[in-house]
Amino acid sequence: MTPVAPPGCDPGCVAVSAGTMVDAAWAGNLAGYNTIAAGFLESLRSLSVFDRLFADGAIRRIPLRTRLAVSTVATVGHEVGEGANIPVNSMAFAASGLDSRKVQALIAVTNEVLDGTTSAGAALLSTELRSGVASATDAAFLGSLLANAPTIDGSASPLADLGNLLDVVNTKGAGKPYLVVAPRTANRLTTKATTGGEQAFPGMTPNGGEIAGVPVLVSDQAPAPDSSGHGAVLIDGSAIVGDSDTVAVDASENAALQLASNPASGAQQLVSMFATNSTALLATRWFGFELIRSTGVAVLSGAHW
């Protein structure tokens, strides 16, 4: 790839193409990161709501960039007596498409760290990249699902609130409901006691579990508790179609980065990885999803659990 000057940058500043793990002549010597990339999708299962639903088979898998015809009026069957007329049904379809989305996580570490990396160090880098990709995935996934989702007022009873959510979302016998909560809400459900002092929901832990047979997932991107109370999201995985590509991990010792969590556009002060004896590690993930039934998601707010 020919280096190209970034927009708004002076002629002395050029963009450097990143080396990839599959290029032995460039960044393939960072062989340890092949292990990180290989384990990404499996490890994301416990970090990301999207990946958990995907791994469980709750989300119907459709290839990315696929044109969809979504049935909005289902056909109905009838019992027909001998010699009787057979009712004819009509259907309605809505056109949609499974567009691809991209999330990335970028970190920079010194080469001294890489050269002296132990298994614990590699695990740390893997954890940071995994967490970044998982958080960005759920931010896109839950943010899109909640944009037009119906909201239900909560109460003091988790079971009553779950029942109200199920009445909205789980309208078919083949539904695959998942309850998504924030970490503090998971803590509250885990430690909630009955009037006799016993754990109200033995299947719950701070990292998730289940309530009344419904899997509970924990995400930083779920509605956080506030002065009005706790919140939660009930998602029917069967109302979602989607797909995901493999997470790619790239490394470059020659990139020039704007070391900021909120990078600005235009000409900026860049830091050379080569000059600072550092390496940039970039995790990239392409995925997509589409809610094909508007009642497939419901939000709970103001619960006093």
Regions found by a protein language model. Name each.
Residues T2-A18, A24, V49, Q269-W305:
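Protruding loop/beta-arch "assembly-hinge" segments enriched in small, turn-prone residues
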Residues P3-V103, G163, G296:
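Assembly/oligomerization interface modules of large self-assembling protein complexes
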Residues R60, R65-T66, L98, A105-I107, ...:
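A broad, low-specificity signal marking well-ordered, structured residues that form hydrophobic/aromatic
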Residues R65, A69-S71, T110, A182-R184, ...:
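Structured loops at beta-to-helix junctions and adjacent beta-edge loops in soluble globular domains
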Residues V70-E79, G116-T118, R188-T191, E290-I292:
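Short helix/loop capping segments that flank catalytic or ligand/cofactor-binding pockets
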Residues A74, V113, S135, A139, ...:
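Short loop/turn segments at secondary-structure transitions that flank enzyme active sites
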Residues I86-V88, F93-K176, K192-G196, V299-L300, ...:
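Alpha-helical scaffold segments that mediate packing/assembly in large oligomeric complexes
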Residues T151-T279, R285:
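Extended oligomerization regions of viral-like shell subunits
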